[in-house]
Amino acid sequence: MHCHNDDVRFSSSSIRIHSPSPKEQHSLLTNLQSCSKTFVSHLSNTRNSLNQMLQSLKNRHTPPPRSVRRPNLPTQMLNSVTQLMIGKSSPISLSLIQSTQFNWSESRDENVETIRGLSSPLLCCASLSLTRPNESTQSVEGKDTVQQQKGHSVSRNAEERVLISEVLVRTKDGEELERKDLEMEALAALKACRANSALTIREVQEDVHRIIESGYFCSCTPVAVDTRDGIRLMFQVEPNQEFRGLVCENANVLPSKFIHEAFRDGFGKVINIKRLEEAITSINGWYMERGLFGIVSDIDTLSGGIVRLQVAEAEVNNISIRFLDRKTGEPTKGKTSPETILRQLTTKKGQVYSMLQGKRDVDTVLAMGIMEDVSIIPQPAGDSGKVDLIMNCVERPSGGFSAGGGISSGITSGPLSGLIGSFAYSHRNLFGRNQKLNVSLERGQIDSIFRINYTDPWIEGDDKRTSRSIMVQNSRTPGNLVHGNQPDNSSLTIGRVTAGVEYSRPFRPKWNGTAGLIFQHAGARDEQGNPIIKDFYSSPLTASGKPHDETMLAKLESIYTGSGDQGSTMFAFNMEQGLPVLPEWLCFNRVTGRARKGIHIGPARFLFSLSGGHVVGKFSPHEAFVIGGTNSVRGYEEGAVGSGRSYVVGSGELSFPVRGPVEGVIFTDYGTDMGSGSTVPGDPAGARLKPGSGYGYGLGVRVDSPLGPLRLEYAFNDQHAGRFHFGVGLRN
């Protein structure tokens, strides 16, 4: 910057966020949570890199006359110029230069004495050059460089005060600003610089930054002019352009509507850096809220008031699967086909990577049941600005034998249901394709179930995530739920041989549908295992009058689940149609529905559930709807309220935390067969004098466990009889 002999000038550089180099894009990917540098923070960082700003302005003085020889000098000198260079890595160079008409051929001492003996006002200044620490300092000056005052320190000159008589804001050409509102903005930003105030260089420098930080100006140069009334301080500013348009580059997923909303308030107004910063922050926040790898990387103002916004979005370049050893954590060969895992992911190549989407993908892979641990590691894909994803998977043991126990509803004479034992073999990952095979045997005092189940969670080649399940089962369950309480204390069991296939798939978020075809061969047997067709009351045990009923069922089911916890909303609808493929096969239609709704009231939770069903056609008596018991109307034994062709059961529960995993609960239940008990073949409920409707109420405790909630409850029915109930899991 060229110097003038009649002013003191500060110049500041305009600030621009530079476009990232490939190396900086690499840094962008490694620091996912970093935000773009704003104009204000960039200016602040630049200010921190300044060591000092130096200028020598000394008050006029009139020393007593001395008899010394002096050269022909002007009566007034104000020839100091200060220049400030701001750069990313360049040193800061400050110099103070004085142009004089001294006869420098005289000796050094004589010149010093001459300066001290001036009777006219004189501003003395030194020539200094400052660089960053640890950098070499070089000073190359011409013949006019003054070197006498090397002892002046930076801090001392910065703290010297100069009386300012007037403070003005002007254009860079010294003219008045056309827009007075901008002039007022600049004046309002000043803190120290006021008329008739003594200022230091540091205070002037700080006010320069305040004007820049107001956001309306791209440059500000303080100029000191000596007038007859004193020193006038002018801030020569260059306002920003008016905002006339916006160009956004590389924003593939950022909605254009969101960009327009972020910048809408600034159209037609002078560009304000602070408002641009707010817009950039909102855009970066949009990416962060969605977990997207995106950031505003550059912003620039073009001619005509066009703002150019550049966005860096990290697209997925490649996705790979890496299996890790369960014990050592080292890479190993996995048993699962990588394609089986990759097709579970919603993240695809070419998409902008989302951490939230990646978390959902991790949860999906864990839900397959074959992985012990899953994590996603994003890595830069070279200098392409894209990202490679590595999914680390630790596999669980694929299969084995297990044994356990459970609760059966077969024994109803005591407060607790009978215990059953189980033995099973399962394979979670057949052929490395996440296919499941389960062979189990459950045995109780009366109950017994042998089941073979094969499930393919996702049929290969299907893009709708359709699953297939094939089941073969042989079961024996107590018949006393419908045909119990026989006077001779005899008991009977219902034997069923079932085989079927079902297909399930999600068809909407939180909605799942199932369709299947099931064949059933069922009949009743006495305690010795002999087939029987009538009970003690001569009520038929089969619909066909034969020892066994055979049915081909076509099944349709739709289930809605909310968040999945026990207090969330749930709705299920099921319809089964008996197909008379052969004349003796049963033909009927059965419809059932269940709904549950939870409401949180402070720490407590209110849960309301409702279930019901109806059967039309010819069906087996033991297939009637059973009312009463732990999962129906508490306070009654299993099936003690009634059994009918139709039913409705409602329940209300208020649960509240007690301590840790323990909850207390207060409940009431009501159930009715809607007068349909007599329409069941043989009217087994009427023969046993079941009321057909009833209610119960009580209280209990629940404990969370790996098996699900353990429920211990005590309830009274409408006959004032009390009964304990114990159950595992949520009520049906």
Curated annotation (Swiss-Prot):
For this UniProt record, give its keywords in alphabetical order, as a comma-separated list.
Chloroplast, Membrane, Plastid, Plastid outer membrane
- One GO term describing the cellular component: chloroplast outer membrane
Q: Which residues form the signal peptide?
A: none
Q: Where is this chain's protein located in or outside the cell? A: Plastid, Chloroplast outer membrane
Q: Which InterPro entries match?
A: Bac_surfAg_D15, D15-like, POTRA
**Does the record bear Plastid in its keywords?**
yes
Which family does the record assign?
Belongs to the OEP80 (TC 1.B.33.2) family.
Miscellaneous field: Probably not processed upon targeting to chloroplasts. The targeting is independent of the general import pathway.
**UniProt free text on domains:** The N-terminal domain (1-52) is not required for import, membrane integration or activity.
Q: What does this protein do?
A: Plays an essential role during early stages of plastid development.
Q: What is this protein called?
A: Outer envelope protein 80, chloroplastic
Q: Which gene is this protein's source?
A: OEP80
